[in-house]
Amino acid sequence: MITGEEINQCITDNYPELIDKIYPIFTTVVNDLSVVYSITTVSGGYVGQDILQLRIFDSDYDVATEWKRKLINLFSTEKENKAIVLPTVSFTGALSGGGDNFRDDLQIWEITAIFVLKTKERV
């Protein structure tokens, strides 16, 4: 099972410009880029599976879709056939879905990417 802290660490280690722009479940920041994550555990144990949903919010569609591309490249590991190794967990990931939505109430784009992560606890 992967935690939000590990997702945050993985993203900020690779993209330090996202430090303080990553939030669990929701964000109240609508005047700047923000990335919101949610994790659903499908199966647990020593080897498990999680669904990671990333939502990128920005008023500029091109900026949001560029960040989506970067995060897809980070979490879709099947192309290189390698795992991402963190101190307490390692995982492989595959893009499972996503989409684009314009939030008319906030005048901001919400770009979503959904990943299936196969996790293994590190002892």
Regions found by a protein language model. Give the residues of each.
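A broad, low-specificity signal marking well-ordered, structured residues that form hydrophobic/aromatic
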Residues: S34-V35, L52, A113
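Short amphipathic alpha-helices in soluble, non-transmembrane regions
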Residues: I11, W67-N73
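Small/polar-rich, solvent-exposed N-terminal microdomains that initiate assembly or binding
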Residues: M1-Y46, D62, E78-V89
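A generic structural motif
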Residues: I56-D62
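Short, well-ordered beta-strand segments in beta-rich or mixed alpha/beta enzyme
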Residues: D50-I56
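Short, charged interaction patches at domain edges and termini
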Residues: M1-Q9, T40-Q49, V89-V123
